[in-house]
């Protein structure tokens, strides 16, 4: 067998065949696209030795901090730190969050070596405060290392990556928790069926999604995690989101029709992933993962930053006992004339996770504040995002999540002009529930069409007026005024004047209200690709606008992204 060089810590009885070394052209490959295709196709998956050499090559190419512990550092410190204690007695650092070490295909020497390496990493990386993926990462790489020191160096390089555009491993609770929120955002957009199931069977859906990294680094069988890691080393963190979304889709497909209890959902998903080889091959998992038309890496990074900012503003930067802050709609303090507590909780599961940390705050209702746009603007300006709810005289219920402060309408003077972001969506609750998101989410090719005309409202020229470098612009998904939005009719989110309010545009309007907020109309529009949300012309019975009250500071206004 050609794998003895990297087989010291491997229990070959557990390993599914070492295989003979394949073509080694990957070791000299410098073209990123070629390397990406090789990784996705499992070019080095059948040879233990080749995979080990590829891992060494890819990890050595990671840009790192100037002072990064290497193999010689490990040899110097391991005796002093571990001493004569048996490896099995070494306590794991708190930052791994009581995560068990997956044994994968390690022999007894390898299992002990993982504890020694983690202990030394804890000594050399005092800035790590939360890294539950570390035990799995060390155990995995040890299969492809000649000795403990080499494994230590490779893990250290991954942890010490200093490329700002290359996120690899979360090392703080803030980064970890914001990743969970980002995964929740992505699940709500790209796995609507599975997400709906999670909302229905769990009291706190983000508590379920907080396990998303564990599904990969901990529960996935060895033959699967290695295929994922092959691609991860080439393409980075976004791959993990893809794979976790694919796992959620497969769980929904296989288990969706079976009864589930809310307190067992996390365990059910863990067991499903652990036994994935019973229903899904590694190739099928990756095929499903890369079939998801996900946001760009830049857009996901911006969403992650927005979630981190929201957590920081609420003081959630270290692990604490979860107080169900993500289930913000409480029966005892929520009262609406339009929706029930359950319906509001369903709506809350659709909104971006960083706002779901907040509690609903009633800003405006026509029953109390009067039927006029001036009163509407008076009570809603200064708040973003907002949730608009409408009940018609025919008892139909619909609404919209609006990402941007209504005061933004003034930036174009008296001209009726669209603004807002790709996080806006419209929905109906009665007679049946349906949500319509930005059309670009399901058809990202529309987002690559730049507006060619000069009349794309205030947004088209604002970045030039503000002197913003186009290379630094935010994504259209999060930006409200820094970005030349894609195809005009696909980016008409919200507009308002003294005469009317429009939500969604392009060959129709998802919602239109007159200046007295008495009558409205709804139709298909290009921005949300929606069906009419209720009767196409309707009379408003009740209209409510809800803001988002910060749980910590009790401040209902959220500032816009910079």
From Swiss-Prot:
Segments forming domain TLDc: 337-549
GO molecular function: GTPase activator activity
Membrane topology: Peripheral membrane protein
Keywords for this protein: Cell membrane, Cell projection, Cytoplasm, Cytoplasmic vesicle, GTPase activation, Membrane, Synapse
UniProt subcellular location: Cell membrane; Cytoplasm; Cytoplasmic vesicle membrane; Presynapse
Cited SMART domains: TBC, TLDc
Annotated ranges, domain Rab-GAP TBC: 42-259
Protein function: May act as a GTPase-activating protein for Rab family protein(s). Involved in neuronal projections development, probably through a negative modulation of ARF6 function. Involved in the regulation of synaptic vesicle trafficking.
The protein, known as: TBC1 domain family member 24
Species of origin: Xenopus tropicalis
Taxonomic lineage of the native organism: Eukaryota, Metazoa, Chordata, Craniata, Vertebrata
């Amino acid at each position: 067998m050609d794998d003895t060089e990297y087989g010291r810590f491997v229990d070959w009885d557990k390993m599914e065949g070492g295989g003979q070394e394949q073509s080694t052209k990957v070791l000299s490959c410098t073209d990123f696209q070629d390397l990406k295709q090789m990784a996705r196709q499992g070019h080095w998956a059948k040879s233990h030795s080749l995979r080990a050499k590829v891992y060494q090559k890819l990890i050595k190419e990671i840009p790192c901090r100037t002072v990064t512990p290497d193999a010689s550092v490990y040899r110097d410190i391991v005796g002093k730190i571990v001493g004569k204690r048996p490896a099995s007695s070494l306590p794991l650092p708190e930052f791994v969050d009581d995560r068990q070490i997956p044994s994968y295909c390690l022999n007894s020497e390898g299992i002990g070596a993982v504890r020694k390496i983690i202990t030394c990493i804890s000594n050399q990386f005092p800035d790590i405060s939360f890294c539950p993926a570390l035990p799995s990462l060390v155990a995995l790489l040890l299969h492809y290392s000649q000795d403990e020191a080499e494994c230590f160096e490779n893990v250290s390089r991954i942890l010490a990556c200093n490329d700002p555009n290359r996120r690899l491993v979360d090392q703080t609770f803030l980064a970890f928790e914001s990743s969970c929120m980002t995964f929740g955002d992505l699940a709500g957009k790209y796995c609507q069926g599975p997400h709906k199931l999670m909302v229905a069977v769990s009291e706190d859906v983000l508590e379920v999604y907080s396990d998303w990294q564990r599904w990969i680094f901990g529960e996935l069988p060895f033959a699967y995690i290695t295929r994922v890691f092959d691609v991860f080393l080439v393409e980075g963190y976004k791959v993990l989101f893809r794979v976790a979304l694919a796992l959620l889709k497969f769980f929904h497909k296989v288990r969706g029709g079976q009864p589930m209890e809310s307190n067992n959902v996390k365990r059910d998903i863990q067991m499903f992933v652990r036994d994935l080889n019973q229903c899904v091959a590694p190739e099928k998992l990756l095929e499903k993962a890369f079939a998801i038309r996900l946001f760009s890496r830049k857009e996901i990074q911006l969403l992650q930053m927005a979630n981190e900012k929201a957590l920081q503003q609420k003081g959630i930067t270290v692990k604490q006992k979860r107080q169900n802050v993500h289930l913000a709609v409480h029966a005892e303090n929520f009262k609406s004339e339009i929706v029930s507590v359950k319906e509001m909780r369903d709506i809350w599961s659709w909104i971006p996770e960083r706002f779901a940390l907040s509690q609903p705050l009633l800003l405006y209702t026509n029953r109390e504040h009067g039927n006029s746009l001036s009163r509407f603007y008076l009570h809603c300006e200064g708040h973003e995002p907002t949730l608009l709810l409408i009940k018609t005289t025919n008892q139909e219920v619909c609404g919209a999540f609006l990402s941007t402060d209504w005061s933004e309408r003034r930036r174009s003077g008296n001209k009726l002009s669209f603004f807002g972001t790709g996080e806006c969506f419209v929905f109906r609750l009665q007679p049946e529930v349906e949500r319509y998101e930005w059309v670009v989410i399901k058809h990202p090719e529309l987002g690559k069409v730049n507006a060619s005309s000069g009349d794309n409202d205030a947004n088209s020229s604002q970045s030039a007026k503000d002197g913003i470098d186009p290379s630094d612009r935010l994504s259209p998904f999060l930006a409200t005024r820094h970005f030349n939005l894609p195809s005009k009719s696909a980016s008409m989110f919200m507009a308002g004047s003294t005469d009317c309010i429009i939500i969604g545009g392009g060959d129709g309007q998802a919602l239109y209200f007159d200046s007295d907020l008495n009558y409205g109309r709804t139709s298909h529009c290009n921005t949300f690709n929606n069906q009419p949300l209720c009767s196409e012309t309707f009379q408003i019975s009740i209209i409510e606008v809800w803001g988002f009250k910060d749980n910590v500071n009790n401040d209902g206004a959220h500032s816009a992204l910079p």
